[in-house]
Curated annotation (Swiss-Prot):
Assembly and binders: Homohexamer.
Enzyme Commission number(s) of this protein: 1.4.1.4
Keywords recorded for this protein, A-Z: NADP, Oxidoreductase
Protein family per UniProt: Belongs to the Glu/Leu/Phe/Val dehydrogenases family.
GO biological process: glutamate biosynthetic process
Pfam families reported in the protein's UniProt record: ELFV_dehydrog, ELFV_dehydrog_N
Name of protein: NADP-specific glutamate dehydrogenase
Superkingdom: Eukaryota
Gene3D superfamilies found in the cross-reference section: Glutamate Dehydrogenase, chain A, domain 3, Leucine Dehydrogenase, chain A, domain 1, NAD(P)-binding Rossmann-like Domain
Amino acid sequence: MVLPVEPEYEQALSELQNSLKPFLAANPDYEKALEIVQIPERVLQFRVVWEDDQGKAQVNRGFRVQYNSALGPYKGGLRLHPSVNLSILKFLGFEQTFKNALTGLSMGGGKGGSDFDPKGKSDGEIRRFCTSFMSELFRHIGQDTDVPAGDIGTGAREIGYLFGAYKKLQNEFVGMLTGKGLAWGGSFIRPEATGYGLIYYVEHMIAKAAPEYSLSKPETLVAISGSGNVAQFTALKVIELGATVLSLSDSKGSLIAEKGYTKEFIKEIGQLKLKGGALESLAQREGYTYHAGKRPWSLLPVVHVALPGATQNEVSKTEAEDLIKAGVRIVAEGSNMGCTEDAIAVFEASRKAGAGGVWYAPGKASNCGGVAVSGLEMAQNSQRLAWTTDQVDQKLKKIMAECYEICLSAGTKWSGEEIKDGVLPSLLSGANVAGFIKVADAMREHGDWW
């Protein structure tokens, strides 16, 4: 059988297979689990016809990849972006399966969305698209079946429209989406969760590998890419702790702050992005330098912590080498698969070289805070109650600490490396192996492989 070319999915699968080699060599029976888990349980593709402001019919493709339900209902975001295709959604759903396993919560993996572009669309057009999209998706989701969430292009407004459409179609008010408004079933710190969780994870990495670059020190220089939800709240948490944020970016370029970003400026960028604006409109601000068409990684002479927070494959091999020249010690993904395979190889080679090397954390571990709080939102909905901000934040800190410990332990045991003095274990191997074992064991107990 000739399979379609799916580069993003094949990259994610290749990364997992490479990480699992030492574990599978010692546990060959799990080869069958790997063969089975890589195929989604169900793939849905459908037509979405909606009316534009001129009264004309427009059409887009809608998708939902229900990847794996071994640990709970399918769980993963809905992405609205012109680049959306089956390869990207399979990669995201595959990664989501193991990411959700690392949270310790009862969630399977899935991903969906459409090649619809919300940029430049009116509020009415987005509402009509969401209503049409949900008119097909509603028959495949539910609080105990599949619980979608937001993602790129799908914010609070879109979640509201999707929830309203589902409520009308099913005549029930249930927690079948996460990222909801606080007044109707949402959770405190859900918007902040991916960025906050990333920093909680990174704090553990720094404490073990590079305590001299504590985020409580203004001398610690942090590079962040992106300027959406993840990047904004990552930056705000870094500033709150005391370190210096040097960069943000968007699809058109990077904005470098010589003396560091302020909380007020980050919030201003948040308002700009809500209106669909670009960072280039802030290029003339004193103390900031805009670089059109460039990502931040090669623009900074000195950086200690790098946090990709934009999209997949946003750090290349050359950029990874430039970060090492700039003195980076910690790289943790806020975006999914933010680093290319070649970039990861550069970081892992640096780690293996010994003391002073780069310690890299993959997105499935370091950015699982977002879906963790989505899981906490599901728990609150099931009990018909709402926890306080502090309660949710404390639970998130605990989940990220446990995720770090799981990855550290599995990386130490199953990396296949002889861990020498000064060499840190691979969090890449640890995250992949720990997530895989948890999913595979549940599948075996369900009779999905033997």
